[in-house]
Amino acid sequence: SLKTLTVPFPACGTPATYSNFGELFGTTPDTEMRKISQDNETGKETNYYLPRNLSVLRILEGCEVIPSKCLMNCFVLKELHLPASLYMMGEKAIYGCAGLKNIYCQAAEPASIHADTFESIRFNVCRLHVPQGSTEKYKQDKHWKPFSLIEE
């Protein structure tokens, strides 16, 4: 079953006309899938079903924005790879992803994020991996500094 997924953009559509990550997998209940709840494009909470063993999401270079609520409640994810091209993450973009144990940031400069982008992340458990020489930039950024485990 699917454990790792590499995508150019973590949603359906384009950055201008996106829906959320769950839309990639659909709303049909399946015992081999894990149910998550995300807001759909109209703002209504919808149940989506992700592969039960999906634990790693890699976002390819070229993605510049992770939209608001895009990965909301994707608690199945254990590892997230963010490209160097990423410069912004929307409100609650990764909200509810409490299962994350590692976030790999390729950008030397911290992406611009909202105060609630990482809400529900366990900052004392999730390791933030950053490029060589950029630890201090992440530690000094008001929204990234809650991560107690920052490694180069």
PLM regions with names:
Residues S1-E152:
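Solvent-exposed loop and capping/linker segments of extracellular ligand-binding repeat ectodomains
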